[in-house]
Amino acid sequence: SQNPYANAFTDVKDFVFFDTDWQDILWGTTASTSHELSVAGGTDRNTYRLSARYMYDGSNLKWGNNNNQRYNLRLSNTFHVTDAFEIESVIAYSRQDQVAPTQIGAALTSSVQQPGFPSSTIDGKPYAWGTWGAPNWYCELGGDNKLKVSGVNISETFKYKFNKHFDAVAT
């Protein structure tokens, strides 16, 4: 558009005021889901429970890749070796995959944008004026931080019942 102030801001080619709602531009709705499946069974001397879980947590941030996924697998066993001696075994595995925009800090901790500052050019490309950049594009084009964490936990418990008032437990 043409500059409405002919003798001022002569270096600014796009001098219009937009009704820019940064909350609406940056944030939206998302979905989270969690699924679990377990199987249990056994006999008088041996019981088990196997469970698996998947969780996906999306992000309200509309720009860039931002989500969290978690996988869990767990096996619990109880072996009654004798009437007085019991072994409990728990083996658990978990994995977390998290993705966040590399420049999310620059986008979310930036000062409030200038009044009328557009989020993009008229043809949908990133917009910047001097050192002011549209924060949505920092998230969209700044790359991804990927965090992958896996863990295994093994727990064994040995119980011996001497009498109805006294047990010995070792883990």
Residue ranges of predicted features:
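A beta-strand signature from Gram-negative outer-membrane beta-barrel systems
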Residues: 1, 32-34, 47, 53
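Surface-exposed loop/interface segments of Gram-negative outer-membrane beta-barrel transport/assembly proteins
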Residues: 1-18, 55, 59-153, 167-171
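Transmembrane beta-strand segments of Gram-negative outer membrane beta-barrel proteins
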Residues: 19-20, 43-52
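Surface-exposed cleft-lining segments at the edges of enzyme active sites
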Residues: 22-24
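Residue-level marker of alpha-helix boundaries and capping positions
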Residues: 26-27, 64
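Outer-membrane beta-barrel transmembrane strands
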Residues: 27-44, 138-171
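Transmembrane beta-barrel domains of outer membrane proteins
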Residues: 38-42, 51, 76-78, 90, ...
